[in-house]
Swiss-Prot record:
Its main location: cytoplasm. Residues 174-184, 460-538, 555-568, 579-647, 751-764 have a biased composition (Basic and acidic residues). One of its GO terms (cellular component) is cytosol. It comes from the Eukaryota. This is Auxilin-related protein 2.
Amino acid sequence: MDDFTGLLARDFGLKPQGKSAPMASQSNSSAADFNTFASSYSFASAAGKKSDSLPVFDDLGRDGDDLLFRDVFSGPPPKYGSSGDSRSPSAPAFDYDVMFKEPKSKSASSMPVYDKPVYDDEDVFESIPELKIPSTSSQSARFENVFSSISSSPTKHRKQNSSPFDDLMGNNLGKKESDREEKGSSIFDDLIPGFGRTSSPPAKRTTSETTSQSQKPPYRTAETSSNVKEDPFVVLEESTSTLREPSTGGFTDPLEEIGKFNSRKTDHSSVHGGVFVDTDPLDSLGKSGPDMNSRGKSHLRPPGNISGSQSPVESSGLYHSKNVSFDDVVEPQNTSTPPPTNSDGSFESSDDVWLTVSEIPLFTQPTSAPPPTRPPPPRPTRPIKKKVNEPSIPTSAYHSHVPSSGRASVNSPTASQMDELDDFSIGRNQTAANGYPDPSSGEDSDVFSTAAASAAAMKDAMDKAEAKFRHAKERREKESLKASRSREGDHTENYDSRERELREKQVRLDRERAEREAEMEKTQAREREEREREQKRIERERERLLARQAVERATREARERAATEAHAKVQRAAVGKVTDARERAERAAVQRAHAEARERAAAGAREKAEKAAAEARERANAEVREKEAKVRAERAAVERAAAEARGRAAAQAKAKQQQENNNDLDSFFNSVSRPSSVPRQRTNPPDPFQDSWNKGGSFESSRPSSRVPSGPTENLRKASSATNIVDDLSSIFGAPASQSGGFQDVDGETEERRRARLERHQRTQERAAKALAEKNERDLQVQREQAEKDRIGGTLDVEIRRWGAGKEGNLRALLSTLQYVLWPECGWQPVSLTDLITGASVKKVYRKATLCIHPDKVQQKGANLQQKYIAEKVFDMLKEAWNKFNSEELF
């Protein structure tokens, strides 16, 4: 931050008239200087509150300090004593402990004990003869003015350390120290008539005066000698109070005092010459101070004045102070922008706010340590709404930090503290007295949004300031002529010097205004260029971002498409695999179903065949048993019949023997004529059982058995006549035995021989029955197999025909697809068509197939009926194809 050294001289052309700036040597003691400045600048209006003289205006209360400081730091500061005691230079001039506490009782001293004000007996209007008022002892203790070093006499300026504003005007307004010492006048003797004399502290103003200043004279009669004039730089201490309290001091103009003292009994309109009757450029001043934010910075900042000096700031209808005439705003207060005049010769009402140090309170404890040397950060500006039909100066023009040529040398700690104080004061409460809220507190605008408007508003403000300055100059000339008649001669020279300084100041202001405008234009051009560059950079970044996003989007889409295609391929492959597996599974299931069906059919056929064989065996066994029983019954019957026949034959033989005995003589005599070896021809008696036996045909052995008794018959023929009878009997009994075909007992046969012959006969019968049963079983089995083949042929023929469709006579096709019709257990290995190109390979594969599916081979391997049927059919088809192949191809 910049210090105050030379700041007014650089920006406004004001230079002190006293000795050379004593502040230059006190740059290190910045804290003490700032405290002195704050105390002198804030509480100058309260210096004469306890004087015996009456205030200029109607006070709202006897204790005006409470009203003045009730909103500021929680109560009024303690007052000076009337005695001329002075504090040590090391003690701070601003008692913060007292300011931040609640106000105390009336009886106790509530004002802080400041350093003894310098040049208490000097008046800012000392050079005006008519306003020179003798000061009493009660008026000696006053608050130190901000420009005490300017307004005080050079002699006193040497005696005591001045305020930090000694060097504020820059080499004492450009005048030499010798000139100031010779003239011995105040700093503003040549600037404004009467602006250098010692005056009493500012007096309070009534509420009526704040509302209608044009109807009442701003000052009372001459009897209020102690409170006739106010310090022109303490005007904004009245704006520190809000609507809750009236303003505590009147803001008067030295030029206005000139006219008022020349014609005290005249009307207010006659004093102003009918020009400024209804015009109050500071109409809203004193009603409300700017809002303070958390950092103590206001939204308003004086234009071109970083040192914290007074300057008009547009409040846009939010700062409605008490009605003060145009004379209250004068150039000794560094007003570089006077309001312009309208067409009818009167000034327009202005909402300019005069910021003073009294409105810049400190919330930090004072310290003697130097502040940090780093520059402050730039503050964002906030536009303020304009009042309707009133010209305004945007605050952005005041907030802009305009660089100047003299800024480089202003870097002392005192200026840094004052800049912080200025920033802190800008953030105060901006709620107007009429209840309008601060428009800047609720809206945020861009830093560069009001740059163009700021330049135009600044130019308008400069034009108004020029018009105001010219009018003030004319008024001062007229008032000075009136006042010069009753003034002393030495004031004329001071007035001329002030006029010269005023003209020089005007020239400097014009030059500085032109420089500021040029710098502002350059700054605006730079800002526009920076904004354009920033906009271009943002556009380029946006284009790059869009291009990058497009590339990323295209890449992402390509990746998504590739992933989708890969996923689709994988899905298709998986579906193909699943389909193949399903088809294979279906084929295997069909084959298994066919095999199971074939097995079930074979098992059923086998069961049926076994059942039929068992039934056939049972039937055969039953028949054999029946036949054997019948044979045994017949044999028993034959034996009984034979026994009966033998009995009858024996009886007949006996009868015949007796008869033959009677004829022995005949046989005796006839024996010589017929040899005994020739048997006699006899007629054998018929056997009643012979026909039935031969008709049965059950025994084939009946034929050979019929020849058995031939032997004994022949023997009987050869025997003698005695033996012939026996032979005849044997033949009689042997004939039936040979005729029966069963086992017959032979007379004279031993028991062993008879048993052996019976066993042999039984074995023969058993073998014959067994052979017959086997033959019958084979025939039955063949019949069952044929029936089963006929049954399963309906199912298997369909598959075989489907397999051989289109392959009739094509041996290669049949051999390459043979695995689809054969069962897995046959041992056939699939063969590809590429292996069946040559005739030799076809012949070789055909031989293998023949060995695998030949019906006899299949029968030997224990195949079932279904497999046998398939083998027979396939073998027949292969044989036909082989015959065709063998006839067509040579190999």
